[in-house]
């Protein structure tokens, strides 16, 4: 059986920092529509939420777990590693749903996809925002935040043979990217960054864009609930009118 036969629905979860909590609501809506992913690809915050879901937890389980966390404490590699080890299996092979984790290789700044071996180091590397985390060494290579090279990993799902790709997009620059397209008018760090994002949208069959309000920008229980609700509302609306 080839990969195209194995994977019907692929879910791509974007990076976006704390805004990534909206992915939980998106996953809950997918459950309500009886749409179980056969493959999950995640970048940065999307890799963490995706890993929790791929481990067999429901969206409600993940929300319950997230509600017990003082989120500012996770803004460091040691705390994040402890959280992952407490709540995730050791290896990709132990996951209930196949998972792809996107990281950025240094110094090349090219995307690298982990889908086997140890799980926690890959998650930490994918979430390693440069201004908050140290770079992560895996084997002989150095990695950082996956969002640098691939903020929305729809291409990963497509390359793995998924027949339908549903993308949950909480990237904070998304609205600017869609307005300016491939322009280099100073709104983006570089042309390649906006291009890879727009290509990801083109690889998606369905794109869910949670509308994130001010309450959802702040780390904390109130912000988390607002984000999850925004993800659920956006997903239900999009899935009803694809």
Identify the role of each PLM range.
Residues 1-43, 51-242:
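Patatin-like phospholipase
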